[in-house]
């Protein structure tokens, strides 16, 4: 309703390896590792997918096709949006960190997650990311009653939002 998404801390995400990284023993002293940890903790992020027709995503994140997918736009001029690199955990070399290091660490995931085709929106000073909702896609297993509720809600909030049933393209 307010055209925004909650931005989570990385520790609130579902991947237990989130925020982990590799480094050579002795290259990063304890104070540098603490600084990285603190800087990662200061960031908030939204995890988004580029795909709306991925069966696994619907099963894992949309209540087994009973839920919805929201098609949205993020202003890339206003927010730092980065594609996830599925090359494993980020590898830090040298004893120095850059201002961008925490975002780089949080932009790497294990290859097993690559089906998500994820992009992340990073914010450091906000709890929300402004978005523009373009479409709402309802799951193939959504009840008629729930679909009707979603239809009424969209009509009241913003009738220009497209309502699409997933079974029309999956």
Kindly label every feature range from the protein language model:
Residues 1-170:
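Partner-binding and oligomerization surfaces adjacent to conserved cores of proteins
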């Amino acid at each position: 309703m307010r055209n925004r998404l909650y931005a989570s801390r990385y520790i609130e995400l579902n991947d237990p390896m989130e925020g982990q990284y590799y480094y050579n023993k002795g290259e990063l002293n304890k104070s540098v590792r603490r600084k990285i940890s603190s800087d990662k903790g200061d960031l908030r992020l939204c995890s988004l997918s580029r795909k709306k027709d991925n069966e696994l995503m619907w099963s894992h994140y949309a209540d087994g096709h009973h839920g919805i997918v929201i098609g949205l736009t993020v202003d890339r001029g206003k927010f730092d949006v980065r594609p996830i690199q599925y090359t494993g955990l980020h590898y830090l070399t040298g004893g120095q960190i850059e201002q961008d290091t925490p975002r780089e660490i949080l932009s790497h995931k294990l290859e097993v997650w690559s089906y998500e085709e994820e992009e992340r929106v990073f914010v450091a000073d906000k709890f929300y990311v402004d978005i523009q909702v373009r479409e709402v896609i309802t799951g193939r297993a959504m009840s008629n009653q729930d679909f009707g509720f979603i239809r009424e809600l969209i009509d009241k909030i913003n009738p220009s939002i497209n309502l699409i049933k997933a079974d029309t393209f999956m």
